[in-house]
From Swiss-Prot:
Top-level taxon: Bacteria
Subcellular location: Cell membrane
Membrane topology of this protein: Multi-pass membrane protein
Keywords: Cell membrane, Membrane, Transmembrane, Transmembrane helix
Name the UniProt record assigns to this protein: Uncharacterized protein YxcA
Species of the source: Bacillus subtilis (strain 168)
Length: 83
């Protein structure tokens, strides 16, 4: 694995996944999955649903991100060679 990929993976694990979890929790509040007054069971239930969504998303998104960078990098290289 290249050094760049290690940096991207660290950023992905430390920043992207937790921030997506926070955004999903806020969306849960807005969609009233978590009602006021906030109870621990409602919060944990919504958090569990968010985690169940983020696990397959995380497993799918990063490899697709790497693949897209590689493909679009090839496209950019061919455009530079043509132009």
């Amino acid at each position: 694995m290249k050094v760049q990929h290690k940096k991207e993976l660290k950023f992905y694990c430390i920043v992207t996944i937790p921030s997506a979890f926070v955004v999903l929790t806020v969306i849960s509040f807005l969609l009233q999955e978590i009602t006021f007054p906030v109870t621990a069971s409602a919060f944990l239930n919504a958090s569990w649903h968010n985690l169940l969504f983020l696990i397959p998303f995380g497993l799918f998104f990063y490899p697709v991100h790497i693949w897209m960078k590689r493909e679009f990098g090839r496209w950019n290289d061919t455009e530079k060679k043509r132009g």
